[in-house]
C-alpha cells in the first residue's frame, strides 16, 4: 500500500507508520532470548534464569527499544520510497486509534525547502581595496616600537637621559600610585590600592582618575570627585559619585627603541638590514590586507545572496544550529577559564536570529554550489594550505599538520568552497570598488 504523506504547511509533513504486532513480538522474543543468556538474578547461575522471569522483568524495556528501532527503520524506508528530503529529526507519536494487529504512529517532520536564487546580475557588492605604502609601514613600525617600550624614572639621569627638566607626570608616562576612594565617607570594595601602576593615556582608568594624576610629582597628592558610569561593571558603585585621594609614588617616562640594525634583528631580520625589514613588513601588511578584504567582501556577497534568494527555513535546522551555537559559547567560556562553563545556563533563544541566518545561508550556498559546480578541488585546497603556511617559520610542518587531521582539512575545504562562491558571484554581480585606508579596513573587518 502506498504511503500517504500529508502536507501540514510550507515544510511540515506527516506520515503514518504501521508496524505489524506479530513482527514486533518476534523481535521482542528474540532479544529477550539473547538477553537471557547473560542476565543475572539472585539464586540463579548466569544464563540459567527462566525465560519467563527474564520476560517479566525486561519485556517493557525491550519492547520500547524494538519499537524505537522499527519505527526509525520504517521511517527511513518510507522517506526513501517517497523521495523525502527530511530536515532534522522526525517526532513520533502513537495514533489515538490503534488496530488490533498493528502499532500505528504518526511521524511529523520537516522537509528541505526549494531554494530560489534570483538573478545574480542584480546583486550589489561593494569591494574594498587598499594599498600599502610608506605611511602604513611607518605606522606599523611605531606600533612595534611601542610594544618594545622601556620605562625610566623621570628626573633621574640614565643611559637614555632623564626625561626632561619637568618631572611632573605626563601623557604616556607609567605612574605608580596609592589611592583611597570613598562613597559618603565609607570605603568600598576595590576603591583602595597601594603601588598601583598604569600608563597615562592608555584609557585603563576612568578619565577623571587619569586627569587627576596628570601633572602630579612624586610625593604629591590630589583629592577629586569621580562619578562612575551608570553601566560600570561594578554594580555596587555604578552611577554613584566617589571621592578619591591619589598619591603619586613613582613616575617613569617611556623610551622607544631607535629604528636601527638591532631593532631589525629583534624582528627576525638576521643581518639587521632596514630595507629588508621594511620589505618584510610591507609583505605582511599586504597579506593581512588581502585577508581582511576577502573577509569583508565575503560578508558582502553573503548579504547580497540572502537579499535575492527566496526560501522557507526548517525550524528543526534552526533549533539544531541554536544548540550548536550554545555549545560553542560554552566552549569559549571554558577557554577563558570560566568555572563550570560546560553547564552555563545560556538560553538558545539568544541565538535564534543568528542561527536562522546561518541555516538560510547554508541552504543558499549548497544550492549555488550544486547548480554551478563550485565544489572545492584538491589542488585548490592544497594551494590555500600552502598560502596559509607561508606566514609560519616552518611551512612544510604546517602543511603536514593540516593534512594529518581530516577536520582541519574539512575546514579548509569549506573555506575554498566559500571562495569559489565569492568569485562566482563577483563575476556576475554589480561590483563597486572602494579604496579604503588600512586602518579603516581593519576597523571594518573587526565589525564584520
From Swiss-Prot:
Range of residues in the leader sequence: none
PROSITE patterns on file: FKBP_PPIASE (PS50059)
Disulphide bridges: none
Catalytic function, reaction form: [protein]-peptidylproline (omega=180) = [protein]-peptidylproline (omega=0)
Family the UniProt entry places it in: Belongs to the FKBP-type PPIase family. Tig subfamily.
Originating organism: Burkholderia ambifaria (strain ATCC BAA-244 / DSM 16087 / CCUG 44356 / LMG 19182 / AMMD) (Burkholderia cepacia (strain AMMD))
Protein's UniProt keywords contain RNA-binding: no
Domain notes: Consists of 3 domains; the N-terminus binds the ribosome, the middle domain has PPIase activity, while the C-terminus has intrinsic chaperone activity on its own.
Protein name per Swiss-Prot or TrEMBL: Trigger factor
Keyword Nucleus attached: no
Domain PPIase FKBP-type per the UniProt entry, residue ranges: 172-257
Subcellular location: Cytoplasm
GO CC terms of this entry: cytoplasm
